[in-house]
Swiss-Prot record:
Record's GO cellular component terms: cytosol
GO molecular-function term, one example from the UniProt record: magnesium ion binding
Protein EC: 4.1.1.31
Active-site residue list: 138, 575
Cofactor(s) needed for function: Mg(2+)
Name listed for the protein in its UniProt record: Phosphoenolpyruvate carboxylase
Catalysis performed (reactions): oxaloacetate + phosphate = phosphoenolpyruvate + hydrogencarbonate
Enzyme class of the recorded protein, top EC level: lyase
Protein origin, superkingdom: Bacteria
Keyword tags: Carbon dioxide fixation, Lyase, Magnesium
Keyword Metal-binding: no
Gene label: ppc
Function: Forms oxaloacetate, a four-carbon dicarboxylic acid source for the tricarboxylic acid cycle.
Length: 912
């Protein structure tokens, strides 16, 4: 049975109606701001863009002065943002309608549970599933928090539009509120005036928890267990969705991440969940006002009641409220001990705050849960369980999911930093003076000896230490303290960027050992390798095989339930070898590494370092997960959620629920479903892919690494220099100087190609590789079509290429090419354009479609609708880049270009 994707069921008539209202209010606000004559120029640009007269559009834009350009840019940057909000509202509405009316759709949880329930080991599968979105602060969310708050207000107003139409809400008042939001939005700086600090990034991301993630996850977990129970499967310990966090712990290439930011991240996270618990307790306290005049609580509740400091005469016959008072007192004392603060949203009396020392703290979240369950059990005896279910279920689920820590913080550092620190430690401890000069075999032998036989901390001497080593040691010390204070789940992994050898992994273990986070018997934090480049992916098999064979590692895995996580980097492998090479090498690496783990009795799990775009491993989540290699999901899967993707997916509780449902359902589906195509046929497909990818890699590298004009083209014909100046993240755009390709981060690399509308990382090298394969044998086209129809990996691969071809615009890209200084550099565009045309032709052949996005009609309509508006922004951006690069006075250009970057990113809906 084929189910509908909710994204393809949106009512575009409703979206168009709302966009019409938003556009009208935007026009009125803009006209009031700039006057009729100036607004007439905006309308003229819209008409010219719609007529597709490119030269005329360029001429009219170039005639605008800088002052006019600011207002025009603001208008066209705001319009796609408003369209996005309307589309998000429609999706959220569809989620509610389909769930409330029990309609099926692709990825619906009930259908997924029904599928699993047929398995003999259904309980084990559902109990162990754990899908973890890991929120990161990579610099692709270019909108300010202030702007996001305004868009939230507009979102909520549009959610009530149906009530406006039927008269439940006053239309005039509603319209004026919407107008006010749009007027404020038009006069608010879209881009930050100063570079973000890590602390800003932490608070920005944590804002999604109270409004969306906590209610969505608790609702999802509750529903998950209810559906399992319908099949007589009781899942007491299941946490199908938990959250991860990189901000504050990811110091790879970011000098501003320190022990202090790690402490801050953990503390602020904990504050968020304590605040949630306090609010929920207040609701329970107010709601459950049962009197002993009408019922008798259990002896256990009576005991809690008597421990309460609540001496109000109005509570003497209300044992449940007295019990809640005691529970809150314990929770307040716990927060004070753990975080040094007292939440403002409490109901216990001020004088009782002075006597908290007489109230015991909760030693762990389960003690808190136990007290609540005591009350629930008592109420269940006297009432229908449906009554208590509505009061208690979500807070009890929240305790299991979020504990006192909210989300698990990942630590990450580059392998070169670890090597430097370990070399210094070994030298200062008198163990080895020339560690970095040792062979790989010698390094491994030395490191294993230290880990297995030397219990001391190598830093525990009075010898002076480098600034780098001091900084790193302080971070590990803080990690140890946080785990002791907030529980084991607050930090569970340390990721090593650029893992190129087994010694890289053992060096990480040495650093963890300095504060007893690993010892010869167990590991409190797991060492997680990150394989990023194509070469690293090829070497991963040998590295993991050797690492898992060490006796000490086998002991560590026992303390980690025999799971070993491996992180896969999509961005650098794409930048290194192109889209096909990246995807295929990642696919093969997963398949091989999973088999290695199975052979050695270890469950390999994966952390997917995806970005928002196809070029960074992005694309639709459901399809991306179901496209993973067969048997490669062993209970757990983690993936990064970055930048604007966080707002798109988790901006409100309804779309958050839906996207979490998609992630979990896809993971479970991939775990239990059988391959649609035989293993023998898949083997044939793999053989063909090896040939295609080899060709694609050659084509990609011939341009990117062998054409001497390519780098000049990239730095001149994209806004990379302008993007590097944006205040969109705490992390530098490049590890080295900006014009160094090897040090250029994948995010600005992809972001720049998106802005210039080429979308290069999402398709280059694909067309020629497929065309050459087809030309070699006419039957190959039929094989590729079979692969597209029957192999989820290949279908997802081509669908993503299709999407990015549809978002590219070669006419606009040609204008960016005009920014190049010389003709040789400009010729690079001709190479790119020829490959684009070929790729589009071949993709449509394989898909057997007449047009791009044939399987995503709503996305096609959306792009068709918004293209005329945000295409204008590209031409404005090109004009301002020309003026800015010719003019030594940069101020005005630095204020206009970021507006255009914001608008184009909003229009494309995935920037980096």
């Amino acid at each position: 049975m084929t189910f509908t994707k909710l994204e393809n069921s949106s009512d575009q008539a409703v979206v168009a109606e709302e966009v019409k209202i938003l556009t009208k209010l935007l026009n009125e606000s803009t006209r009031q701001l700039i006057g009729d004559d100036a607004f007439a120029k905006i309308q003229d640009l819209i008409d010219t863009s719609a007529s597709k007269d490119q030269k005329q559009l360029e001429s009219k834009i170039s005639s605008l002065n800088n002052r006019e350009m600011i207002v025009v840019a603001r208008y066209f940057a705001t319009l796609p943002l408003l369209i996005n909000i309307s589309e998000d509202v429609e999706l959220a509405s569809k989620v509610n309608v389909f769930n409330n009316t029990d309609q099926d759709y692709l990825g619906k949880l009930s259908d997924t549970i029904d599928l699993v329930a047929q398995k003999d080991d259904a309980k084990r599968i559902l109990e162990n599933v754990n899908v973890v979105p890991v929120l990161t602060a990579h610099p692709t969310q270019i909108q300010r928090k202030t702007v996001l708050e305004l868009t939230d207000k507009i979102h909520h107003l549009l959610r009530s539009y149906r009530d406006v139409k039927n008269g439940t809400i006053n239309q005039r008042e509603w319209t004026e509120q919407l107008r006010a939001c749009i007027e404020i939005l038009m006069q608010t700086d879209i881009i930050r005036g100063h570079k973000l600090k890590v602390s800003n990034e932490i608070t920005n991301v944590l804002a999604y928890y109270p409004k969306a993630l906590i209610p969505a996850i608790t609702k999802f977990t509750t529903r998950y267990k209810e559906l399992a129970k319908e099949h007589n499967l009781t899942l007491d310990q299941a946490t199908p969705i938990t959250m991860g966090m990189w901000i504050g712990g990811d110091r790879d290439g970011n000098p501003y991440v320190t022990a202090d930011t790690l402490e801050l991240s953990a503390t602020l996270q904990s504050q968020v969940i304590f605040e949630y618990y306090m609010k929920e307790l207040k609701k329970l306290y107010r709601a459950i006002s049962l009197s002993t005049s009408y019922m008798q609580p259990s002896a256990a509740v009576e005991k809690l009641s008597k421990l309460s400091n609540d001496d109000s005469p109005f509570r003497t016959d209300e044992p449940y409220r007295r019990a809640f008072y005691y529970i809150e007192s314990r929770l307040v004392h716990t927060e004070k001990e753990l975080l040094g603060i007292i939440d403002k949203n409490i109901f216990i009396k001020p004088h009782d705050l002075e006597n908290l020392d007489n109230i015991p703290v909760y030693n762990n979240p389960q003690e808190f849960k136990s007290d609540l369950e005591t009350i629930k059990a008592s109420l269940d005896e006297d009432h229908d369980q449906a009554v208590t279910h509505s009061f208690f279920t979500q807070i009890l689920e929240a305790i299991d999911v979020f504990g006192f820590h909210l989300a698990t913080i990942d630590m990450r550092q580059d392998s070169s930093v670890n090597e430097s620190c370990v070399a210094e430690l070994l030298k200062s401890a008198g163990i080895c003076d020339n560690y970095s000069d040792l062979s790989e075999k010698e390094k491994v032998e030395l490191l294993l000896s230290e880990l297995e036989n030397d219990p001391r901390n190598l830093h525990a001497n009075n010898k002076p230490k480098s600034e780098l080593l001091q900084k790193e040691l302080k971070i590990y010390k803080t990690a140890r303290q946080l785990k002791d204070r907030l529980g084991e789940d607050v930090i569970k992994q340390h990721i090593i960027s650029h893992t190129e050898s087994v010694s890289d992994m053992l060096e990480q273990a040495i650093m963890l050992k300095e504060y007893n986070l690993v010892d010869s018997e167990k590991a409190r934090i797991q060492v997680v390798p990150l394989f990023e480049t194509v070469e690293d992916l090829l070497n991963a098999r040998e590295i993991i095989t050797q690492y898992l064979s060490f006796p000490i590692v086998k002991k560590w895995l026992v303390s980690q339930n025999n799971y070993q996580e491996i992180m896969l980097g999509y961005s650098d492998s794409n930048k290194d070898g192109g889209y096909l090479a990246s995807c295929w090498n990642l696919y093969k690496a997963q398949k091989d590494l999973t088999a290695i783990g199975e052979k050695l009795g270890v469950k390999i799990t994966y952390m997917h370092g995806r970005g928002g775009t196809v070029g960074r491993g992005g694309g639709p989540s459901y399809e991306a997960i179901t496209a993973q290699p067969f048997k490669s999901i062993n209970d757990r899967i983690r993936m990064t959620e970055q930048g604007e993707i966080i707002q798109n997916k988790y901006g409100n509780k309804d779309t958050a629920y839906y996207n979490l449902e998609m992630l979990a359902s896809a993971a479970i589906d991939r775990m239990v479903s059988k391959q649609a195509v035989s293993e023998e046929r898949i083997t044939d497909f793999r053989s063909s892919m090896d040939k295609i990818v080899e060709e694609s890699n050659k084509i990609y590298r011939k341009l990117v690494f062998e054409n001497p004009a390519f780098l000049d083209y990239f730095f001149q014909a994209t806004p990379i220099k302008e993007i590097s100046n944006l205040n969109i993240g705490s992390r530098p755009a490049s590890r080295k100087k900006l014009t160094d390709f090897s040090g250029l981060r994948a995010i600005p690399w992809v972001f720049s190609w998106s802005q210039s509308r080429i979308m290069f990382p999402g398709w280059y090298g694909v067309g020629s590789a497929f065309a050459n394969f087809i030309n070699a044998d006419p039957t190959h086209l039929k094989e590729l079509q079979e692969m597209y129809k029957g192999w989820p990996f290949f279908h997802s691969l081509l669908s993503n290429v299709d999407m990015f071809l549809s978002k590219s615009n070669m006419e606009i890209a040609r204008e960016y090419a005009s920014l190049c200084d010389d003709e040789e550099t400009k010729k690079v565009f001709d190479i790119i354009y020829q490959e684009w045309k070929l790729t589009k032709k071949v993709i449509l052949q394989i898909e057997d479609h007449d047009d791009l996005l044939a399987e995503a009609p709503i996305l096609k309509q959306s792009l068709d609708y918004r293209m005329p508006y945000f295409n204008i922004l590209n031409y404005i951006q090109i004009e301002m880049i020309k003026r800015g690069r010719e003019d030594e006075i940069q101020g005005v250009y630095q204020s206009i270009i970021p507006i255009t970057i914001n608008g184009v990113a909003s229009g494309l809906r995935n920037s980096g």
